[in-house]
Amino acid sequence: MTLASIRRGYHVIKTLLQYGLDDVLPPKMTPWYFKLARNSLFWIRNKHKGKSGGERLKLAMQELGPVYIKLGQMLSTRRDLLSDEWANELAMLQDKVPPFDGALARQAIEAELKAPIESYFDDFDETPLASASISQVHTATLKSNGKAVVLKVLRPNVETKIQADLLLMSQTAKVIDYLLGEGNRLRPSEVIEDYRVTILGELNLKLEALNAIKLRNNFLDSDALYIPYVYEEFCYPRLMVMERIYGIPVSDIAALKAQGTNFKLLAERGVELFFTQVFRDNFFHADMHPGNIFISREHPENPYYIGLDCGIMGTLSEVDKRYLAENFLAFFNRDYHRIAQLYIESGWVSEKTDLQAFEQAIKVVCEPMFNKPLDEISFGHVLLELFRTARHFDIVVQPQLVLLEKTLLYIEGLGRQLYPQLDLWQTAKPFLEQWMAEQVGPKAMFKKVSTKLPYWSDKLPEFPELIYDNLKLGRKLLSSQQQMLDKYLKYQQQAHKSNYLLITSAILLICGTLLFNQDATLWSPYVCLISGAVLWIIGWRSRPKNRKF
């Protein structure tokens, strides 16, 4: 461990203690040696006693900087782990940090381009358009066609800083795991590993560019979503160049109202976009917070979304998609037995789970939701409550479903902010039912066969040879099995013969010994002893030597 990491560790501990976060730890996490260590840092006192635990955690993460802010944002979506009070506080964390020097940004961009900025761009503005914890954005125009673009560049040394903080988080999580023991609900190491994968993915702008290109291609003909054009020739691991857009932030409700935006259509399109990305394309934007979404300025009566920042994307397996769709349909049909079955069939919970107990737990959680009108029931909260319940039955955490749950909560919250009367179920139900109809029945079977047809057509000429080889292999196996059986029978015969001779020899030897003490003829004990010895030698030599069949 380096001196810098020790210094950073002390700063983290000091900050957490100054916000009194040691006071909110459960008893399991405060054994005598923890209390001894805490008392040894007597000069660090809680300076925020009047604030709630959730607010103190939010302020501490804000003070610790970008990596912890992003961790807090991620934790705010893990409502299966945290209480609503804590999750709501963490959701208020903002990824806003002071910009770094524009001259440093120029150097970083030129290092990636391996040429002066002026070789490819005009009007480069060293004052950033936006600044975040991992990167910042500068404007320019393309020299080749004069189009306005933005250049997104990583902060200097951000990878090193993030790796150092991740290592510290990982070590701390292992300690907490140890203190909480087996079966703890929080599972810190698991949470930090999910976070590590997510944040390291955001450090590669080339990957983000490829994600944006794929999402753009999926919605090229859509009137609901627009993804800015990415100039792939200028994209590198630390630099990304894309078309500049001029939209209205989705959170600016006043500006959207002023231009006469059709809020009902906009909210319904948001829901449709989510289900289209998940079920049609199996590639969904998993960071749909308001800072990444804009609304078009033109055609307010027929508005569309503009999506930015494709650093975090999610995918589901075909199995996950089917079980997810069936879960939603089963919930709205109040079929709790089927929901429990689906969780077990999908492998999300162990097959050893008590089905009846699991079904009853789901019913207890979900049934009260139907006291509300259908248009007030939240898909995201349904999924969240099911995950929370499944955690008591040892759910195997699925990172892709955590991303999906987070995205669904964002989309729902956004939809109801834009149009409070949004009936999510009525918007989504036809989509889910149509998708399920495409997955089962004659049409689905024909589609699957059609998809596999080119593969089987390619393999068809090999079938005769394959059948012949299998028959030949079968004959070899039968022959081999017959040989093994013959060897086994021979072994048994030899073993029986040997055992018979050895037992007979033992009887003769015992008889010979006894005859010495009786009034027997002179020769009879010797005959028994000699015969017994001879039979023992023959029996011993006739034992089967090889037990391999």
Swiss-Prot record:
Listed SUPFAM superfamilies: Protein kinase-like (PK-like) (SSF56112)
Keyword match ATP-binding: yes
Active site, UniProt feature: 287
A molecular-function term among this protein's GO annotations: ATP binding
EC number(s) per entry: 2.7.-.-
Swiss-Prot/TrEMBL GO biological process terms: regulation of ubiquinone biosynthetic process; ubiquinone biosynthetic process
Pathway: Cofactor biosynthesis; ubiquinone biosynthesis [regulation]
GO cellular component labels: plasma membrane
Top EC class, one word: transferase
Transmembrane segments: 498-518, 520-540
Annotated ranges, domain Protein kinase: 123-501
CDD domains xref list: UbiB
Residues the entry annotates as binding ATP: 129-137, 152
Membrane topology term: Multi-pass membrane protein
Record's subcellular location: Cell inner membrane
Keyword flag Nucleotide-binding: yes
Short name of one Pfam family: ABC1
Annotated family: Belongs to the ABC1 family. UbiB subfamily.
Purpose of the protein: Is probably a protein kinase regulator of UbiI activity which is involved in aerobic coenzyme Q (ubiquinone) biosynthesis.
Protein name (Swiss-Prot/TrEMBL): Probable protein kinase UbiB
Annotated organism of origin: Shewanella sp. (strain ANA-3)
